[in-house]
């Protein structure tokens, strides 16, 4: 992130110095405040602490180092907002069990206004009637186990088609396959098919989907950019656009919304012409939401169309990006741990055989595969800091006073590598999950890859189905080696998420009979 230092510091210091001193003076907590990392500046706090520091690791790693120095509960300021970082079992349980309702809000970020349908997207919405009913719609109607069961043929067919595409790329014993790109194409195509009924193949799909894919990538970049209002949330700074990010957000949103609007109108017209309004006739997620939602939604100021588009966008974000990212790490770990890969292949060969492909109904019997997925999620959680929370009133975490309006980062990556909770925490060892009943649902506060409490990820069931089935196909269908027969580089990229810097490039060979591809 690059900040226009002179402009920001001058304007903000002049405007907020008195306010900052007044609020600091007026604080009279009954309990001690958490440790605060040193180096903060007046008014702007620690805005520059993580900026151009020469450390290109993920933010979760940097915050983990600070936890080693200052403890598992500490704070810093990003402008005016106070940020609380927790990474111990006790602190995480305090936040998501004892204080779950108090930490149920989301901080206000400008991208939520300009890119997130004015915060109508489920993961951006504040806790309240709109959020509760929208989450109920998503969990009970769109992503319920019964609904996902009805769409399992779509998942299987799409994964099968992608596996066959991967097979056609094999050219002798020396051609290199970019598995990272393949996974991104698979997951993007799968979620577009399930949401809108669109068949997408890179370079061959319709123009709308290609345009949306570009806008989607722009969204991922813009949502992580520093915007002045995020650090100094008063109306004046909503109109200050030194870096041009607001202009870029508006342009990107226009592209995204036009695609969603076209998809929505296509579905409305189809339903009117074909009279597919009866229960059970839904062909994709947009059909499902249309059949369940009234014209005006909850009296919250959002139209039906806005809520549908915001909900669809939330599903795309959850599925297309984080699922591909996680499978990519999982396959990289298996390639670098050939004994684990061989054991997983032997399990599938024994339980399923080599004359058909793994199906979703087989997953329950593939215990070692399930352990692999759990272990990958432990080492590389899809949201290493979760989506930030904000407390709606003062509370206590680990004996510390946390004032109202504090932004919460739960460092899940640090938590799930805590040597007090995990033996050999940085080692890839699926066996650790074989004899335990630890699951993904956030009730074991040392393992919360999808979050915990009322703001946990609603797309967990879908993500796990796709991850298990995709990894099972890749494990069953091919043998792998690296081009230079050296372990894959596991360098992690900078940013809020944990992305692998270098793609997973492999030489692959089929394990099954040709007629199965």
From Swiss-Prot:
Cystine bridges: none
Single GO MF annotation: iron ion binding
Gene3D superfamilies: Cytochrome P450 (1.10.630.10)
GO biological process: alkaloid metabolic process; methylation; nicotine biosynthetic process
Entry EC number(s): 1.14.14.-
Keywords: Alkaloid metabolism, Heme, Iron, Isopeptide bond, Membrane, Metal-binding, Methyltransferase, Monooxygenase, Oxidoreductase, Transferase, Transmembrane, Transmembrane helix, Ubl conjugation
Effect on the protein of changing residue 309 to E: In CYP82E4v12
A cellular-component GO term for this protein: membrane
UniProt xrefs under InterPro entries: Cyt_P450, Cyt_P450_CS, Cyt_P450_E_grp-I, Cyt_P450_sf, Plant_Cytochrome_P450_Monoox
Swiss-Prot/TrEMBL catalytic activity: (S)-nicotine + reduced [NADPH--hemoprotein reductase] + O2 = (S)-nornicotine + formaldehyde + oxidized [NADPH--hemoprotein reductase] + H2O + H(+)
Tissue specificity of this protein: Expressed at low levels in green leaves.
PANTHER family per UniProt: CYTOCHROME P450 82C3-RELATED, CYTOCHROME P450 82E3
Free-text function comment from the UniProt entry: Involved in the biosynthesis of pyridine alkaloid natural products, leading mainly to the production of anabasine, anatabine, nicotine and nornicotine, effective deterrents against herbivores with antiparasitic and pesticide properties (neurotoxins); nornicotine serves as the precursor in the synthesis of the carcinogen compound N'-nitrosonornicotine (NNN). Catalyzes the demethylation of nicotine to form nornicotine.
Entry protein name: Nicotine N-demethylase CYP82E4
Organism: Nicotiana tabacum
Encoding gene per record: CYP82E4
């Amino acid at each position: 992130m690059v900040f226009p230092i002179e402009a920001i510091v001058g304007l903000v210091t002049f405007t907020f110095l008195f306010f900052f001193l007044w609020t600091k003076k007026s604080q009279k907590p009954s309990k001690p405040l958490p440790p605060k990392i040193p180096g903060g500046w007046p008014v702007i706090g620690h805005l520059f602490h993580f900026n151009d520091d020469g450390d290109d690791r993920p933010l979760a790693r940097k915050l983990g180092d600070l936890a080693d120095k200052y403890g598992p509960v500490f704070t810093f300021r990003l402008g005016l907002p106070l940020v609380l970082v927790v990474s111990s079992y006790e602190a995480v349980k305090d936040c998501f069990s004892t204080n779950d309702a108090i930490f149920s809000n989301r901080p206000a970020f400008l991208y939520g206004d300009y890119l997130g349908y004015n915060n109508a997207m489920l993961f951006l919405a504040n806790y309240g009637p709109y959020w509760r009913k929208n989450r109920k719609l998503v969990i009970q109607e769109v992503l319920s186990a019964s609904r996902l069961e009805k769409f399992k043929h779509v998942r299987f067919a799409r994964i099968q088609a992608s596996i066959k595409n991967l097979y056609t790329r094999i050219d002798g014993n020396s051609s290199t396959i970019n598995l990272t790109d393949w996974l991104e194409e698979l997951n993007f195509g799968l979620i577009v098919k399930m949401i809108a009924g669109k068949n997408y193949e890179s370079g061959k799909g319709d123009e709308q989907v290609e345009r949306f894919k570009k806008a989607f990538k722009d969204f991922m970049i813009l949502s992580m950019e520093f915007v002045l209002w995020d650090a100094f949330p008063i109306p004046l700074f909503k109109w200050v656009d030194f870096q041009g990010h607001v202009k870029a957000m508006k342009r990107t949103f226009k592209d995204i919304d036009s695609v969603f609007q076209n998809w929505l109108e296509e579905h409305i017209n189809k339903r009117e012409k074909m009279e597919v309004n009866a229960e059970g006739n839904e062909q994709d997620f947009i059909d499902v939401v249309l059949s369940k939602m009234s014209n005006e939604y909850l009296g919250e100021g959002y139209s039906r169309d806005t809520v549908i588009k915001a909900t669809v966008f939330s599903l795309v974000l959850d599925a297309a990006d984080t699922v591909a990212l996680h499978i990519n790490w999982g396959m990289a770990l298996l390639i670098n741990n050939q004994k684990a890969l061989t054991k997983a292949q032997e399990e599938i060969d024994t339980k399923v055989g080599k004359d058909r492909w793994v199906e979703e109904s087989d997953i329950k019997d593939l215990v070692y595969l399930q352990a692999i997925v759990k272990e990958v999620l432990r080492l590389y959680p899809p949201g290493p800091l979760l989506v930030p929370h904000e407390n709606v009133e003062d509370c206590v975490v680990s004996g510390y006073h946390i004032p109202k309006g504090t932004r919460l980062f739960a460092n899940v990556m640090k938590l799930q590598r805590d040597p007090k909770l995990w033996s050999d925490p940085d080692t890839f060892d699926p066996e650790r999950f074989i004899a335990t009943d630890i699951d993904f649902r956030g009730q074991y506060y040392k393992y919360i890859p999808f979050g915990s409490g009322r703001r946990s990820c609603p797309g967990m069931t879908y993500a796990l189905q796709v991850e298990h089935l995709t990894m099972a196909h890749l494990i069953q269908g091919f043998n792998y080696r690296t081009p230079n027969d050296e372990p894959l580089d596991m360098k992690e990229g900078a940013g809020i998420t944990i992305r692998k810097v270098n793609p997973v490039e492999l030489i692959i060979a089929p394990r099954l009979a040709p007629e199965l591809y």
